[in-house]
Amino acid sequence: MPNQGEDCYFFFYSTCTKGDSCPFRHCEAALGNETVCTLWQEGRCFRRVCRFRHMEIDKKRSEIPCYWENQPTGCQKLNCAFHHNRGRYVDGLFLPPSKSVLPTVPESPEEEVKASQLSVQQNKLSVQSNPSPQLRSVMKVESSENVPSPKHPPVVINAADDDEDDDDQFSEEGDETKTPTLQPTPEVHNGLRVTSVRKPAVNIKQGECLHFGIKTLEEIKSKKMKEKSEEQGEGSSGVSSLLLHPEPVPGPEKENVRTVVRTVTLSTKQGEEPLVRLGLTETLGKRKFSTGGDSDPPLKRSLAQRLGKKVEAPETNTDETPKKAQVSKSLKERLGMSADPNNEDATDKVNKVGEIHVKTLEEMLLERASQKHGESQTKLKTEGPSKTDDSTSGARSSSTIRIKTFSEVLAEEEHRQQEAERQKSKKDTTCIKLKTDSEIKKTVVLPPIVASKGQSEEPAGKTKSMQEVHMKTVEEIKLEKALRVQQSSESSTSSPSQHEATPGARLLLRITKRTWRKEEKKLQEGNEVDFLSRVRMEATEASVETTGVDITKIQVKRCEIMRETRMQKQQEREKSVLTPLQGDVASCNTQVAEKPVLTAVPGITWHLTKQLPTKSSQKVEVETSGIADSLLNVKWSAQTLEKRGEAKPTVNVKQSVVKVVSSPKLAPKRKAVEMHPAVTAAVKPLSSSSVLQEPPAKKAAVDAVVLLVSEDKSVTVPETENPRDSLVLPLTQSSSDSSPPEVSGPSSSQMSMKTRRLSSASTGKPPLSVEDDFEKLTWEISGGKLEAEIDLDPGKDEDDLPLEL
């Protein structure tokens, strides 16, 4: 066939993208023509425009219906060679339907195979075949050869019919033994399968079958398969009989492990078809007979054997369940429960075969739950015996009630833990809230502390009624010990303080430091109950002045006691600094003794009646609300300035004094406090007995109040400081104001310059001469170490650390 002048296939049927560079012929006149040019076939067609096709016809397209005709858009090709049943419009031209008639009888061998497939699927013949695509190639080979017109045509069953074919396989195959399904078959060569001849229910010799051109190879393969099946059937006859996969006589060909075995029957005898159908019934009858006469129960038994004998399990359980019931009885007897009627019911129900599993499961659940409750009773002693008895009785009654009570017990424990955490979080938040509150809380809280020292035995009965006793933290225990040590130390220091009352402020400094030293040594001692009663009594007494928020007061006291312990070592360091100046301080005792005395009684709060601005006020008025209702105008005579040659009638102690005493870290907190209009100072005496019996202690309290009150109206007792450090540090200043600068060195001069800058930057209200002189004198007395001692507290004991956490 000459290649020259051959039509382009893509141009003829679709679109050629090569255009003029295509070596094949592009002739529009030949489009859609199904007549082959004879001259072109002979190689003698030299016409430029030949309206016949120069291409062999492999298919009769005029007899094949057009695919695009059934699509929504329809066939839009002008020269479509396929058959059209309906007319169509293409580019405005009407094309009539095709004149040729579709053939009803298939003429090509492939169409015969398709027709045979349809007929076999409809009739569902009992002839099995392989659904694999390899078989189709085999069938093409068979059909291409000259096979006489088969009355039983070769059959290919698609994979979509697997379920139906499986049913046919089980029903058709007889009782002959067969190898298990999952065995590899080496008979698949190069993707091709050879079908075998099989005549069911009758053992037919191979020589009786008709042999076609392929059948010689098939016969050889079938013999090999038969030999292998016999060898494997001997070894696994029992297993194969249980698996219910019998093997046909010639031996089926398997494609691979994943496919189901099928065979194709080819025959030319006319009497074979009724034999095949008779074979179906016979094989069914033989199968029923082979399984034991009756059809259903033996089949179930064989299935149970396939599944591992699970049907026999209830029979064994009937023997085992009474043992379980006895075990449960022994468990209940061990737990000491009277469950005899339940056990009798259980033993009666065990005898009933149908209810065995459910009843034993419930009993086992009941026993486990009751056993868990028996163990949990020892752990949950706080629940009480009545609750545990109720839970065990509920456990006997029903499993749901028992599970409820057990979960309720767990829920109660979790609820308790949540309440404890809530209390802790409330205590922590109240300490934080105290920093933003005004000092009214301190005035309310501190006097009951003083009052409780003399009345420590009274509130013991009241604390028992309080329900907060259970929620004790480590901090509260430490605070209890601290207050108890404080009470014992005050009672012990009352007698030596009476003897030292006459010397004055110098001995007063010693008394305070000695008291705090003893408290610091005895911080880890004491009883917890005394503190608890004291704290509760303080809270109840303070309820007269406040709304009765006891937890807030306790937290205030806790923070104050923490600050007290923090300032103890600072006072000891101050004492070491002030000891060389005690001789100078003694000269000031006469002047200090002339000051008006304020009697500090337990429960008395110190209120500022008048808030004086720093510029204009030169007098500080302190009102005692308990005993002395008169206003005492405490005037600072020029004690510190007389020795320095400055004669002023009164010295207004400015805000810079307190700023020197307190740490610079408190400056933002003072600014936060400036928004509160009321300024109150709470002075806590060292002890009720010592205050009542010591005039120097009263003078020291007056000095502390004067120093605290003489601050600016925006400055109050800082919340991070303790009232006691405000009591002690101003005492050191006021008592040692008149001392000459003997200890002043380079460090003190540097610190004085620093504080001058700090005070001038912080407030520009007071005159700088008085402020700077007073600050310089203060820093010379302290040796420049006062700020460092207040800011940094490096030498804290291990006992102080948990109080600060």
Swiss-Prot record:
Region named Disordered: 139-194, 223-351, 364-433, 449-468, 478-506, 715-805
GO molecular function terms listed in the Swiss-Prot or TrEMBL record: zinc ion binding
List residue spans of C3H1-type Zn fingers.
Answer: 2-29, 31-57
Keywords attached to this entry: Metal-binding, Repeat, Zinc, Zinc-finger
Q: Where is the composition biased (Polar residues)?
A: 391-402, 750-763
Q: Where is the composition biased (Low complexity)?
A: 486-498, 734-749
- Ranges of biased composition (kind: Basic and acidic residues): 364-390, 412-433, 455-468
Composition bias of kind Acidic residues appears in 160-175, 789-805
Q: Name one GO biological process term.
A: poly(A)+ mRNA export from nucleus
What the entry lists under Gene3D superfamilies is as follows:
Zinc finger, CCCH-type
The membrane-spanning stretches of this chain are none
Show the PANTHER family listed in the entry.
ZINC FINGER CCCH DOMAIN-CONTAINING PROTEIN 11B-RELATED, ZN-FINGER, C-X8-C-X5-C-X3-H TYPE-CONTAINING
Protein name, as recorded: Zinc finger CCCH domain-containing protein 11C
Query: Which gene name does the record give?
Result: ZC3H11C
